[in-house]
Amino acid sequence: ADAVPTAPGDQPARECAVCGWVVGDVPDAELPRPRVDVVYYLRWHDRIKIGTSSQPRRRVAAIRHEELLAFEPGDRVVERARHAQFAHLREGGEWFRADAELVAHANRLAAGGSPWEHYARWVAEALRRTVS
């Protein structure tokens, strides 16, 4: 956690390393939760599903998978771009062969933290924009 500047003599506030909010600070409960669309990458055996959701916890829980590989910020436009990018690996629907190229892409997206840590950061940034 990083120190946040305070008045002289005060103990510095600490920022959460995941979401960036000051530890103990809670967003106003009356604020609407911001919509944060993500493209998700779920592995099941030797296939990877590339999909999108504005409610990733619910969506990921509803799909049988072995591993959540990554999230990236984006909506259906980004999802369609990824489907086109990896079309040569398509197995059917939104499922793609877990080829080294696709796995490397997911690994790059996941660098620096878990998918849920990335998502928490994006939600925190969206909340910060609504209160600024």
Residue spans for each PLM region:
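Non-catalytic accessory segments flanking enzymatic or RNA/DNA-binding domains
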Residues: 1-132
